[in-house]
Design a protein with these regions (language model features):
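Zn-dependent metallo-beta-lactamase
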Residues: 17-96, 138
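Short hydrophobic alpha-helical segments enriched in small aliphatic residues
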Residues: 7-10
């Protein structure tokens, strides 16, 4: 009966139209998401987080779930502070150095957690891009590497960049957590490097930065040559692979031309051409450990959009404060067997 459904949903914390909540022992608690979550990604994450036998939460940072994917590879999962999709950071342990890919919001003692897992090894910290859920924890560390186009964006970080997570009364908007567990902002060294730059983690263990503009102007992926893994950043995502526009530039920052859909497509093609160098893909949100044969499907979707941007599968509109102005529109094209590409398109 409808009464029974209401009672069952109330008992589990599920609201109408929402997914079944994921059981969590994290210190953070979800208040709300900014937009509906993808059902397939949610099912994947629910199974992983509730049943994976490698999952561990360390006392030093109760905001992060740690999963072991390889002998030397750990996935660090954390809930997104602003209501967007929850995110991953990845920790590679090399023979002499470790590498942390992305820093999230820096919620909790991220540096202490990394030191705990690695046993205090020297750490190389790198960013895929500058967005808040990937780089706001950078100030937990002394030095961060990134693609050279990302440097001006990271230089814009400041002490008030977390303020938008709270309302005018200081209450958390999307995620319940202790505000004192956010980092105290400090300047850190930003080391911009070119496409193809190689990090040596000891011996013959090398990780290569690959410029993959599209989702962001200075976006980079990383290829672990030893474990044959592509860490793809946000250019690949089982929810929405968001990139730029077909015929306009949505960003106004430096190197903004690298957010265009054509640039995204060309960088996907570059990764397709290098599929013999990696076997698995680890995106920074939702599903990971994905086989590389997904890549041609992404390229096929990109080519279909560029050939006919009007042939989209669905479209969303977002209205601003001015109800008489045109809404912001995003168009979506399905990636065969995976998710969707979101793109901008100015008609006429």
């Amino acid at each position: 009966s409808e009464t029974a459904k209401v009672a069952r949903n109330a008992a589990t914390g599920r609201r109408k139209g929402q997914m079944w909540p994921i059981k969590s022992e994290l210190k953070s608690k979800r208040i709300k998401f900014d937009s509906p979550q993808n059902q397939i990604s949610w099912a994947f994450m629910k199974e992983l987080r509730e049943h994976n036998k490698t999952r561990k939460i360390y006392d030093i940072n109760p905001y992060v779930e740690v999963y072991q994917y390889r002998d030397n590879l750990f996935g660090l999962f954390s809930e997104n502070c602003d209501g967007a999709g929850d995110y991953w950071m990845y920790l590679i342990i090399g023979p002499e150095k470790a590498m942390l890919i992305d820093t999230g919001y820096g919620l909790g003692d991220l540096k202490g957690l990394v030191d705990k897992i690695t046993g205090g090894m020297p750490i190389v910290v790198v960013n895929t891009h500058d967005h808040y859920d990937h780089a706001y924890g950078n100030c937990r560390f002394e030095k961060v590497y990134c693609h050279e186009y990302l440097v001006p964006y990271l230089n814009n970080q400041h002490a008030h960049m977390w303020d938008y997570l709270f309302d005018d009364y200081g209450n958390n908007i999307w995620l319940e957590f202790d505000r004192r567990d956010l980092p105290a902002f400090k300047k850190y060294e930003i080391a911009g490097v070119p496409d193809g730059y190689t990090f040596n983690l000891g011996g013959d263990y090398e990780v290569e930065l690959v410029f993959t503009g599209g989702h962001a102007a200075g976006h980079a992926a990383y290829i672990d040559r030893k474990d044959r893994i592509l860490f793809s950043g946000d250019n690949i995502c089982s929810d929405v692979s968001g990139c730029g526009s077909v015929n306009t530039i949505r960003s106004t920052g430096p190197f903004a031309e690298n957010t265009a859909l054509k640039v995204y497509r060309d960088n996907v093609k570059k990764l397709v051409d290098r599929m013999d160098e990696y076997d698995y893909i680890f995106p920074m949100h939702f599903m990971n450990n994905i086989e590389n044969n997904l890549m041609p499907n992404i390229l096929e979707a990109c080519d279909a959009i560029l050939a006919n941007p009007d042939d989209y599968d669905y479209m969303t509109e977002k209205w601003g404060k001015d109800r008489f102005a045109e809404p912001s529109r995003r168009y979506y094209k399905f990636i065969k067997g995976f998710s969707v590409i979101a793109y901008g398109y100015k008609k006429g």
